[in-house]
């Protein structure tokens, strides 16, 4: 499946792109600003990056668009996707349906300490003999 990710250079969407690539999908993506370190990491995975949100990107003809939370409704590429009724999902929806399906999920939320708490939780689970995955 070819997935085109809007907002690919954000931490969450970049992580999603790598997970999708590792799962065997063809991944391309775009963002308003494409620069290191995220651009370097994604390009090293063989993920094509496009600067900007030109509606012409629909000519890539992906099977699915994954739209990041920071990409607004007035975005020209989003409007083209909606006007043409092209298939799209949010990043969290794609992760839930394709990566986290049939897995136990522990989520850490809050204003401060999420990364530290997640790291401690992953370490505790690993030390207890589990093989946790994690996404920060």
Regions found by a protein language model. Give the residues of each.
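Short amphipathic alpha-helix with an adjacent loop that forms part of the alpha/beta core around
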Residues: 53-62
């Amino acid at each position: 499946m070819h997935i085109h990710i809007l907002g690919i250079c954000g931490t969450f969407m970049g992580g999603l792109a790598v997970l999708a690539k590792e799962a065997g999908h063809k991944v391309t993506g775009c963002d308003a600003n494409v620069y290191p370190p995220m651009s370097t990491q994604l390009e090293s995975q063989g993920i094509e990056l496009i600067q900007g949100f030109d509606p012409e990107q629909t000519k890539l003809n992906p099977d699915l668009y994954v739209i990041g939370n920071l990409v607004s409704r007035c975005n020209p590429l989003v409007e083209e996707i909606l006007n043409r009724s092209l298939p799209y999902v949010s990043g969290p929806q794609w992760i839930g349906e394709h990566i986290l399906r049939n897995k136990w999920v522990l989520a850490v939320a809050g204003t401060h300490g999420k990364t530290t708490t997640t790291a401690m939780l992953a370490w505790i689970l690993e030390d207890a003999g589990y093989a946790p995955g994690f996404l920060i």
